[in-house]
Structure formats: C-alpha cells, structure tokens
Swiss-Prot record:
Keyword terms, alphabetized: Ribonucleoprotein, Ribosomal protein
Gene3D superfamilies (alphabetical): 3.30.1320.10
Pfam families found in the cross-reference section: Ribosomal_S16 (PF00886)
GO MF term list: structural constituent of ribosome
Gene field: rpsP
One annotated Gene Ontology cellular component of this protein: cytoplasm
GO biological process terms held by the UniProt record: translation
Protein origin, superkingdom: Bacteria
Similarity comment text for this entry: Belongs to the bacterial ribosomal protein bS16 family.
Protein known as: Small ribosomal subunit protein bS16
PANTHER family: 30S RIBOSOMAL PROTEIN S16, SMALL RIBOSOMAL SUBUNIT PROTEIN BS16M
Database matches in InterPro entries: Ribosomal_bS16, Ribosomal_bS16_dom_sf
C-alpha cells in the first residue's frame, strides 16, 4: 500500500476548496482517505493554508509521498526543509 499526501477537492462549482489528506494511492481523488492533515483555500484573498505540521511530519517520516502540488505548499511552509534537516542532520 503506497500512501500519498494529496488534495481532496471540495466546495462548489468554480469555488474550489481543498482538504489536504493522507490517502492510499489507489483511491480516487475525492474518495476515501486515512486522515485529514490540513486545508487550502485558493479563492480567498490572501490564499488560506492551514496545516497540522506535526501530523504531516509524522506521515512524511513514515514514508508517505506528497503530490507535486502538496510538496510545493509544504516547501512554502518550510516543512520540507524541516524534514530534510531531521533526516540528514541527526
């Protein structure tokens, strides 16, 4: 079972709202997920991003792979640098 951290679309037509979830890679985009670890609202100004950093950090250490978009959001929040430091600067 490959676990991914990815976006789960919610909201109305033309008003997207994304939950950042941990899900099995075989599940559909808006299908079942294991845990919700944050959300992203690209419509609001400024764009709203809420992350549960502890849960995301735990999942990344367990081997969960973020999607490209989620990786970009995590890098902007500084989580990928934190993971890199924890992994290589013991």
């Amino acid at each position: 079972m490959s676990v991914k951290i990815r976006m789960h679309r919610a909201g109305a037509k033309r008003k997207p709202f994304y939950r950042i979830v941990v899900a099995d890679s075989r599940m559909p985009r808006d299908g079942r997920f294991i845990e919700q670890v944050g959300y992203y609202n690209p419509v609001s100004q400024p764009k709203e991003l809420k992350l549960d950093e502890d849960k995301i950090f735990d999942w990344l250490q367990k081997g969960a792979q973020p999607s490209d978009t989620v990786r970009s959001l995590l890098s902007g929040a500084g989580l990928m640098t934190k993971l890199h430091d924890a992994k290589y600067n013991k």
